[in-house]
Design a protein with these regions (language model features):
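Boundary at the C-terminal end of the N-terminal hydrophobic targeting segment
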Residues: 18-26
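Mature extracytoplasmic enzyme cores
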Residues: 26-507, 518-522, 531, 535-538
Length: 558
């Protein structure tokens, strides 16, 4: 019997419609209803017409952010917003997002090209109708900017992995951004309504390119609710009438650093299989705004056949290889995922391997729950350690293709009847997880059994494992639980430290245990923590004190 899939979207509420407008594209009419939160609900006969309306709505809501996202992807931010963006612009030019997206645009399916073009027509119509809202620095936009933006979003994950390889080679890379999220799936066998429950809970910034745009789309067979990136027409997180899609950061290793041996007589040659090869050199001009003027800097970017040179040390050059470097298929894959009618169709879409490294979780109306540790993973040569720079002077260390999805860590309908991923290894997703590192290639699993164990994950496992016949309200309570797991351990440690510290007299002749180790204010903060109920309720002073204490130990500890 077909089951109805219950989706708990933590960032979405269905509410009465409050306003509407109409948009027309290619002789098709679309209607945009806005609920009381301003979220657009788009109704259209065709996906192209819906795309036009979504473009109009995005521009109406956050035009400047949308245009900034395209500038970020194309590496043109610093010419408008100054030198703080120069380094990022250089990285995007290095990877040629705009150029590759333009050159390979016709490889995108005709359906998605039509949608991207209609989407941008909607943006342009709003700009034409409301010139007073168009920033002076607004650039001309092109359909392939959507493709370039997808590449830009993907790149954050493999760049971070490769940065770790550089660091282990003794080179300090640019710091990688920390990204975290929660997700969980509960199988029909453990729910009160005999249907799967999915929770999608991304923890990304309210600022910048990862500030999501929420939308609901009804266009023929396309019926999707979720969030997208500004400048992209369709959601990648959310649900259709058939499947839900959630993601959290984590996954296989999809990038490498190659150590290149340079010719002492010609620094733009590198040794490969006993011969000197010429590097490819590309010139770029990047503008940097200084006051009212723009300083145009001409730079030269060097490439080996592995990828761009990103560092030099001790006469060696270090090139970066990313498995997505020539890929432009993300838009098509996301569309296939959001139109999949069952798990088999979803797996076929995921097998395109266009998504960045993510813990992907899928629920279906048929009652299936599925996990994939997703990524476009290069097949490394035997004996190569991809966690540090790889010798680049021999064909023996070359990538040997891309692992098919069947090689990746995945599970369908686990025996626990639930699973979650809060940025943990697959072993930490459920009690007695069968997804152990010993079963997989190390760089595919890319974690240990205890990797990134933390209170979010342990709390989720314990709460899910203790429940049965879960109701919708119970699932929401689990997702929103204000309990701070294991805070009692910190309270006990603080009490022990204070208890063994000699008493001294404080102002007014009042003795405080351990006050010689704390200022008066510090002692008061410790008292707040020790007397706290270990809940992060909005009004909790103890929770704030605990957070400040943890942040004082290390920026990422809290």
């Amino acid at each position: 019997m077909k089951r109805a899939l219950l989706i708990v979207i933590l960032f979405s509420l269905v509410v009465p419609f409050a306003a509407s407008s109409r948009a027309t594209a290619a002789n098709d009419e679309a209607t945009i209803y806005r609920d009381e939160y301003g979220i657009p609900h788009v109704y259209a006969q065709t996906l192209e017409a819906a795309s036009f309306a979504i473009g109009y709505a995005q521009a109406e809501d956050r035009l400047e952010e949308l245009l900034k996202n395209y500038r970020k992807a194309n590496g043109t931010m610093s010419e408008v917003f100054g030198p703080d963006y120069y380094r990022s612009d250089l990285i995007q030019r290095m990877w040629r997002h705009s150029e590759i997206s333009r050159e390979k645009y016709n490889e995108v399916s005709p359906k998605m090209r039509a949608c991207m073009e209609a989407f941008q027509d909607g943006i342009k119509l709003f700009m034409k109708e409301h010139p007073e809202q168009v920033p002076k620095w607004a650039q001309e936009i092109h359909p392939w900017d959507v493709v370039a933006l997808g590449r830009y979003i993907i790149w954050g994950w493999p760049l971070g992995e490769a940065g770790g390889d550089l660091q282990r080679g003794g080179i300090q890379p640019d710091p990688a951004a920390y990204r975290g999220s929660n997700e969980m799936l509960i199988a029909p066998s453990r729910t009160a309504m005999n249907a799967a429950i999915a929770v999608i809970d991304p923890h990304l910034s309210w600022y910048g390119e990862f500030r999501f745009y929420q939308v609901r789309i009804y266009a023929g067979d396309y019926n999707v609710s979720g969030v997208s990136i500004l400048g992209v027409p369709f959601p990648s997180l959310g649900h259709s009438r058939y499947c839900s899609v959630a993601m959290t950061t984590g996954g296989p290793d999809t990038s490498d650093i190659f150590e290149e041996e340079l010719n002492p007589a010609n620094a733009r040659q590198y040794r490969y299989d006993g011969q000197w090869r010429d590097m490819t050199v590309r010139k770029e001009k990047i503008g940097v705004k200084k006051g009212d003027a723009v300083d145009w800097r001409e730079i030269e970017i060097e490439y080996t056949h592995h990828g761009p040179i990103v560092a030099h040390k001790d006469g060696k050059a270090y090139s970066m290889a990313i498995s997505y470097s020539k890929e432009i298929g993300l838009t098509d894959q996301v569309h296939e995922m959001m139109t999949a009618k069952n798990l088999d169709e979803m797996k076929r879409a995921l097998a395109r391997l266009q998504l960045m490294s993510q813990n992907v979780m899928v629920g279906t109306v048929q009652g299936d729950i599925y996990y994939l540790r997703n990524g476009r993973v290069p097949i490394r040569a035997k004996g190569v350690d991809p966690n540090k720079p790889i010798p680049g002077n021999t064909s023996a260390t070359e990538w040997q293709g891309i692992h098919p999805m069947s090689d990746l860590v995945q599970i369908t309908n686990p025996p626990t009847g639930y699973m979650h991923n809060c940025n943990v290894s697959p072993f930490g997703m459920m009690k007695d997880s069968p997804l152990v590192p010993e079963k997989y290639v190390s760089y595919i699993y890319n974690a240990t059994r205890t990797a990134t164990r933390h209170q979010r994950a342990e709390m989720m496992t314990d709460l899910l494992d203790a429940t049965n016949k879960v109701t919708l309200d119970q699932a929401i309570d689990i997702a929103f639980s204000p309990q701070v797991y294991h805070a009692e351990l910190w309270q006990a440690r603080l009490s022990k430290v204070i208890a063994i510290t000699p008493e001294v007299t404080v102002t007014g002749g009042v003795a405080r245990p351990g006050s010689n180790s704390f200022s008066t204010d510090g002692g008061a903060v410790m008292d707040l923590i020790r007397g706290w109920n270990r809940r992060s309720d909005a009004e909790s002073v103890g929770a704030l004190a605990f957070y400040a204490f943890k942040k004082s130990l290390a920026p990422d500890v809290a």
